[in-house]
Amino acid sequence: MAENVVNDILKWLETQLQRNEGIKIDTIANKSGYSKWHLQRIFKDFKGCTLGEYVRKRRLLEAAKSLQEKDMSILDIALMYGFSSQATFTRIFKKHFNTTPAKFRENGTMPDTHCFMSCETH
């Protein structure tokens, strides 16, 4: 049953990410029928990371794909994927990819997503 809940959440998250719509844990909890705290526990037990960590990593991966396109500014990409500013986006991006969005854009090589999304292996 928990696996079905998590799989349903993952499908919903992917749809929201593709639409660039906001993702709130309270909304996900309401959709699942579980309390926010219980949902967090189920998700972490099944995926090995918190729901917030998973969403942040997925947003970063989508932002990295957009950076490769080079037709949008870094600020527009940051805002599109839910980061409050370019500075916040740059700080979080650098923490996860060990490079800035601008340098990543110059290089254009996507990271190893399996390693980056390591919480998916559980």
From Swiss-Prot:
DNA-binding region, residue intervals: 26-47, 74-97
Domain of life: Bacteria
Domain HTH araC/xylS-type: 7-107
GO biological process: response to antibiotic
SUPFAM superfamilies the UniProt entry points to: Homeodomain-like
Keyword list, A-Z: Antibiotic resistance, DNA-binding, Transcription, Transcription regulation
Gene Ontology molecular function: any one: DNA-binding transcription factor activity
Pfam families, alphabetized: HTH_18
Protein's UniProt keywords contain Transcription: yes
InterPro entries: Homeodomain-like_sf (IPR009057), HTH_AraC (IPR018060), HTH_AraC-typ_CS (IPR018062), MarA-like (IPR050959), Tscrpt_reg_AraC-type_HTH (IPR020449)
Biological role stated in the UniProt entry: Upon expression in E.coli strain KY2563 confers resistance to antibiotics ofloxacin, ciprofloxacin, tetracycline, chloramphenicol, and ceftazidime (increases minimal inhibitory concentration by 8-32 times); also decreases expression of OmpF.
Name of the protein: Probable transcription factor PqrA
Source species: Proteus vulgaris
Classification of source organism: Bacteria, Pseudomonadati, Pseudomonadota, Gammaproteobacteria, Enterobacterales
Gene from which the chain derives: pqrA
